[in-house]
A protein has these predicted regions:
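PRPP-associated nucleotide enzymes
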Residues: 1-294
């Protein structure tokens, strides 16, 4: 591993490799200019790129940075994208829309990277869009060490699309799972119109498992529904905390007992809702990198 270095804007995850920063400057008209000052000739480069908060800008920054690294003579480039944007747009729901997940995946694949690492894609079928190897990691494996389960614990999927993820979590926790029914507006994609539940959950501890919290509306309605049906406690575990708009206030307005998220997206402490616990994906990432770069 002595021939491996990490480059990034900031050293968020404190990985067990030498870290060297990327310098990003902008011209007066806003054009991006990355600069790689360090020596990368013949080295295995790990490029850690957060795609938050403006993924459209950061994707261009990614492309230019990868090109700069290749031009300096790196032996290989492994790109780490803890949260992969645009994957929610994996289908064309209405004529006139783009299949954005496929387009972005192809752009990233052809940027010059040799491998991509990411966590908990919203839709695993999007893996087929990439044309370079993708190491798809899951932060769900940390769940058993974070929550205590008993005979009255259930795992809840907030919608049908998240059911496979909730099922994996239920297997890890050795607990049954239920699925909430959800309808979403095609016009305002983040707006949940209704939820329904067909299981008896009175007196249970519910653990809602999802990959993303964006506006918080889905989770807030799910928490309220579960409490209205008699759940004694509701814990939410979500990998990617986007927390857009009024998500903090929306979640704080519910009777949620605990929110657990990871640092695939990093916020300041005051940006998180009350009762939030943030866990780091650094150990999982470090282990995966050492295995894949060996």
């Amino acid at each position: 591993m002595g021939n491996t270095i990490v480059i990034a804007n900031t050293n968020i995850y404190k990985l067990p490799f030498p870290f060297l920063p990327v310098t990003i400057t902008r011209f007066a008209d806003g054009e991006i200019r990355p600069f790689i000052e360090c020596d990368v000739v013949g080295k295995k480069v790990i490029y850690v790129a957060s795609m938050y908060p403006v993924p459209s800008d950061i994707i261009l920054e990614w492309i230019l940075t990868i090109d700069a690294v290749k031009r300096k003579g790196a032996a290989s480039i492994t790109a780490v994208v803890p949260y992969m944007p645009y994957i929610r747009q994996s289908k064309v729901h209405r004529e006139g829309e783009s299949r954005s997940a496929e387009i972005v995946s192809r752009i990233l694949s052809t940027s010059g990277v040799d491998k991509i690492m990411t966590f908990d894609l919203h839709n695993e079928s999007a893996l087929s869009f990439f044309t370079v190897p993708v190491v798809h990691l899951s932060a769900l494996v940390s769940l058993p060490s974070l929550v205590s389960c008993d005979a009255k614990t259930i795992v809840v999927s907030p919608d049908q699309g998240s059911a496979p993820r909730a099922k994996r979590a239920s297997e890890l926790l050795h607990a049954p799972f239920v699925v909430l029914m959800k309808k979403r507006s095609l016009v305002a994609g983040d707006t949940v119109e209704e939820l329904d539940l067909h299981d008896d959950i009175a007196g249970k501890t519910a653990i809602i498992v999802d990959d993303i919290i964006s506006t918080g509306t889905t989770i807030a309605k799910a928490v309220t529904l579960l409490k209205d049906h008699g759940c004694r406690k509701v814990i939410v575990y979500a990998v990617h905390a986007i927390l857009s708009g009024n998500a903090k206030e929306t979640l704080e307005s519910t009777s949620i007992d605990q929110l657990i998220v990871t640092d695939t997206i990093v916020h300041t402490t005051d940006a998180y809702p009350e009762k939030t616990k943030v866990i780091s994906v650094a150990p999982l990432l470090s282990n995966a990198l050492q295995q894949n770069l060996a």
